[in-house]
Curated annotation (Swiss-Prot):
This is Hemagglutinin-esterase. Homodimer. Residues 1-14 form the signal peptide. N-glycosylated. The gene is HE.
Length: 416
């Protein structure tokens, strides 16, 4: 009996933390994933092209890198695979951010990589913020614009592709005007509480070789919302650089107006619809890079920041030992993504395990789930300190110990 009594205190003080599994996991069994060609089981090269377990393919919604970003800006583009589905799950994991194309075909003018990257980062920051607190993500087409007899789509010089959402349209005069767009509160069976709407314009907003250039301004306006840009002294002449400048706005469902002062009218033709959930769950993102022979961007990493997002970074270059090509079937990512086959109790930036006993030094925000932690019972300088568990494990251990002690006294009293 004495050995039994001594066993439980020693158990309580001897247990050590478990090293977390590094990579995305889920807690609720209600998880959706946004991937790319590396998670596309319909490819001819599958499964040799996959970075994820083959039986997890149905949970992935995307088949091309950065397609959520491209889909908000392009309606039709032969070289892009756009997001035409929707997901309605609690936990969200992204592995789709590497693609740089069409970085040099994103504006009529040569804004280069930096401006494109800023837009991609800005979009994903807002997407993460929305996805953390809202449940369903659905891309919907908005109602067609009103008829304008003097309206024509802006056409780029050379072969560059100006994004066609928001639609950039050219007016024959500078009379202030507006076009109405509706963000519906219901799309099919999906309730839409909030929308992620792109608000874009070309800076230096005058495209004329003449001697004058009228002021330029554009805004989205409703009874409860007003956001705009105004350029009172636009540049004159075709030689000036014109960048495609975008903000990404959280807008409630309802009727809104796109108003314009100047020659250009900008109005949205599609938007991401979200509906609500009653709790906050950070999204998770896995670093997506090309092999060392190709250029990769870090927009997803820049956008994945606490408290909205947990980012899992690779520790090695993209390395393929048995894949379809040098950019598909990375060994390290396949190991990381295998965690999606199992559910967990605690998710953190350091990793996760099904039943982890974490030291306080292991965890930093954001975390979610049940994360039992060790704390110091006492700490004397120079002497040995003792760890106990500040969680249900601690309570359960000592409750069991008390029960055993009581049983011992009962047995002793019975024989006495």
């Amino acid at each position: 009996m004495l050995s039994l009594i001594l066993f439980f205190p020693s158990f309580a003080f001897a247990v050590t933390p478990v090293t977390p599994y590094f990579g995305p996991l889920y807690i609720t069994f209600n998880c959706c994933l946004f991937g790319d060609s590396r998670s596309d089981c319909t490819k001819v090269q599958s499964p040799m092209s996959l970075d994820n377990p083959q039986n997890f393919c149905p949970n992935f919604s995307l088949k091309s890198s950065s397609s959520m970003f491209f889909s908000i800006h392009y309606n039709n583009h032969s070289s892009l695979v756009l997001f035409d589905n929707f997901n309605c799950r609690i936990e969200k994991v992204y592995y789709n951010g590497v693609n740089l194309s069409p970085r040099n075909q994103y504006s009529c003018y040569d804004e280069g990589v930096d401006s494109y990257m800023e837009l991609k980062t800005s979009f994903n920051i807002k997407l993460n913020q929305m996805a953390t607190i809202l449940r369903c993500i659905k891309l919907i087409q908005l109602k067609a614009r009103s008829s304008f007899t003097t309206l024509q789509d802006v056409v780029c010089r050379t072969n560059k592709y100006l994004p066609n959402n928001p639609t950039f349209a050219l007016l024959s005069d500078t009379v202030p005007t507006w076009v109405q767009f509706v963000l519906p509160d219901l799309s099919g069976k999906t309730i839409c509480i909030k929308y992620l709407v792109p608000f874009c314009h070309l800076n230096h907003g005058c495209f004329t070789a003449g001697s004058s250039c009228p002021p330029f301004g554009v805004s989205y306006v409703s009874d409860s919302f007003n956001y705009g840009f105004n350029d009172a002294t636009p540049y004159i002449g075709l030689a000036e650089s014109h960048d495609n400048v975008c903000d990404y706005l959280f807008v409630e469902a309802g009727t809104h107006n796109a108003s314009i002062v100047g020659n250009f009218l900008f109005y949205p033709t599609k938007s991401y619809c979200f509906n609500t959930m009653n709790f906050t769950v950070p999204v998770q993102a896995i670093q997506s890079i090309w092999s060392e022979g190709n250029e990769s961007d870090d927009a997803i990493a820049e956008a994945c920041k606490p408290p909205f997002c947990i980012y899992y970074s690779k520790t090695t270059p993209y390395t393929v030992t048995n894949g379809s090509n040098a950019d598909h079937r990375d060994d390290e990512v396949r190991m990381m993504v295998r965690g999606l086959l199992y559910n967990s109790s605690c998710i953190s930036a350091q990793g996760s395990t099904p039943l982890a006993l974490y030291s306080t030094a292991m965890l930093y925000a954001p975390i979610y789930g049940s994360c039992p932690q060790y704390v110091k019972l006492f700490d004397t300088s120079g002497s040995e300190s003792v760890d106990v568990i500040s969680s249900s494990y601690f309570v359960a251990t000592w409750v069991l110990l008390v029960v055993v002690v009581i049983l011992i006294f009962v047995i002793i009293s019975f024989f006495c």
